[in-house]
């Protein structure tokens, strides 16, 4: 299956690594954007100044608890008011999200460091 290569826009900047991983895992641009907008869990990324968001694949409710067998993850970086992000001598525009990587996780991943509430509020203001 040949997937369409995502184009950079005013809202999203796609790295070559993220495009490669999208092809590897069979993820479309629309699905990655959906994970960013409608995530189930949000954590600090393993890279400095990044955020990782997760959306479960086919969640089911068993005995009143939400369960699933696979997860979709997206790691991205958004430019803050005091940050300057450079990409090949081009500054990322205000409110543009740089998508660094995407991946599928088989199973339920353990919760790592959740983002503090005050930082989540600051991110939502952007």
What do these predicted ranges mean?
Residues 1-126:
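Ribonuclease/tRNase effector modules and their secretory precursors
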């Amino acid at each position: 299956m040949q997937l369409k290569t995502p184009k950079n826009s005013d809202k999203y900047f796609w790295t070559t690594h993220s495009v490669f991983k999208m092809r590897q895992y069979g993820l479309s641009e629309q699905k990655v954007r959906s994970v960013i907008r409608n995530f189930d869990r949000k954590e600090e990324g393993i890279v400095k100044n990044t955020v990782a968001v997760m959306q479960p694949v086919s969640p089911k409710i068993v005995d009143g608890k939400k369960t699933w067998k696979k997860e979709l993850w997206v790691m991205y970086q958004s430019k803050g008011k005091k940050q300057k992000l450079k990409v090949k001598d081009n500054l990322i525009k205000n409110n543009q999200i740089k998508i660094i990587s995407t991946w599928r996780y088989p199973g339920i991943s353990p919760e790592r460091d959740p983002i503090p509430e005050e930082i989540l509020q600051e991110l939502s203001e952007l």
